Amino acid sequence: RLLAEHRVFTSHQIANLAFNHLDTAEDRLRTLTALGVLDRFRPRRDTGSAPYHYVLGPIGAAMLAAEQGVTVADLGYRRATALAVAHYRRLPEILRVNGFFAALAGYARRHPDAELAAWWPQRRCQANWGRLIQPHGFGRWRDDGTAVDFFLECDHGEEPISITAALAGYDD
């Protein structure tokens, strides 16, 4: 479910979310990929190599659809669309946002007083708040009995909007 909603995770992010060691995560991810639950790709880099990036595979989509009592078509899953994120110009932005939240979730997994109680991607935020605000993510963090709701604005100078213009909608 998490992968379907957030579109793509690196092997390192998945390890942070659910495993104690990267090697264990990579073994499990290889198995899930071989079974068709996940698909993976490795973006091209000019130097070095990128970690594998994982998206929902056809078997994973069928499992998710069955869990929700709908068809794969109703779910809106298409393998080509899932894999197209590999060439999406905003892939680095999605990975930064997912990396931030994966780090919080990983911290919470290792610290019993902490919890990432909510984690919404940009698409879900847009569906909820429309054009009023357009955060890259929303979260609810709990730690030691205190809860904080927050919006993530991930600006790396790639969008033609000033930070003050982006924050204006939050006043409402």
Give the positions of each predicted feature.
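Active-site metal-binding core of divalent-cation-utilizing nuclease and nuclease-like domains
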Residues: 41, 86-92, 109-150, 155-169
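Short, low-complexity, polar/charged sequence segments that are solvent-exposed and flexible
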Residues: 72-76, 138, 169-172
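Amphipathic alpha-helical dimerization/coiled-coil segments
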Residues: 66-118
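Nuclease-adjacent, charged terminal/linker segments that flank catalytic cores
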Residues: 1-84
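Long, contiguous hydrophobic alpha-helical segments, chiefly transmembrane helices and signal peptides
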Residues: 3, 8-9, 28, 54-56, ...
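A generic fold-level signal
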Residues: 48-49, 95, 132
